[in-house]
């Protein structure tokens, strides 16, 4: 007698994941990777957790967010045409409405492109490129009868300048008199220079005197000097003096050690950023990097290397965190610790531009723009090497003050790491689960081990075969650390992925899925 045979039962397997490997938006996102993320964090890696809160510390009520800078005593920023210090407008200081470059030395902050200086401790400001024009009297300071002059007299000519300033004269009909000279003394309305500086004595009309300042596009402070770059040129100030950019003093031994310095690097393209590191200053173009060596103008030199530079609109992305320089390059986020830069952003899976960045000491926060006209705030954890994506926060600048990280957007200045997360909307979407097999499978159940704050909730959903439809499994309310099993209506599929959406603060400690094989595709 022939008896029917029953089909062999397909094996049931259970896979438990406790290591969530951060954000990975590539098509080949591995099992365990997180393909999409909103308001997540790698702080508790290998666990997944939601990000800390943010607080709008200084609301500005709209206006162009033009730059944020940290100084002793607080935060300095520009919104529209107004300069603010710790939330208070600087009375009388009206700037051009546009992005700012800040640098500070000795308590004096320089602001480009306005070429304004500001002293936060005194609340004073002025032009960093003062100028005077009019008729001058060229004379000799010793009242002798020589033919050449060393002094310039005119009403008000002394007001904009200081003893020791290097000032530039223009307007002379005798070309040899046009040039830059150092003021040796000021006697009332008389500027005194080196003997026989000018070719003749007498009155001269239409003369302009200026203490010049370069129009920098990027700037930083290192070794008691401000360093700046633009186009193909690098400058630094006189040692200890943020207002002296063309002070080229020399003696019998050559250029003095305190003199200013500048150089044209002579390569195509414009500088796109600079930064001070523990070992020196680095200047970058999109396709190259220059490191500064030397201790004084006589031995300063820039050594070039063909390496990943800074993306042309990402000069604000250069940040030193954990003794490493991070920045957005044309090929994506990169880092260097003194050697050749390496890419670290392949997991982001997209091209990024217009980056601005900051650090809280261990994490690098990057706000950048993608080709789909979307903004993202990505966070790179320097300890674990994992990425996370927070949201669409569009920061124009970051600053760190008293150990806290701040960022500026059109609504004002935000403090990171504080504030309520009770209404925080978050999302985690896994990559495709294929369970190491090209055959079909059926998902039988999902088990989550969660920890959530009071008032928080998490909803789980599944999608099959990339059909765009999410099937809700269950919603889990807040609670202490616990496991929750979610039943699934089995469905034969080639692959599937899971999505967790939450409100409030929560952590995912493990994700277990029970599956059975469902035979090959036909």
Give the predicted meaning of each segment:
Residues 81-84, 117-123, 233-246, 287-293, ...:
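Structural motif
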Residues 63-67, 71, 80, 84-106:
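Blade-loop segments of beta-propeller domains
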Residues 126, 200, 255-257, 297-303, ...:
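Beta-strand initiation motifs
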Residues 1-74, 309-316, 320-324, 331, ...:
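Beta-sheet repeat architectures centered on beta-propellers
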Residues 100-135:
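Hydrophobic or amphipathic alpha-helical targeting/insertion segments
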Residues 71-72, 79-80, 105-106, 112-114, ...:
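Short loop/turn segments that connect beta-strands within the blades of beta-propeller domains
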Residues 55-59, 212-225, 229-358:
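Beta-propeller and closely related beta-pinwheel folds
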Residues 7-8, 128-148, 155-163, 170-217:
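Small/polar beta-strand repeat architecture
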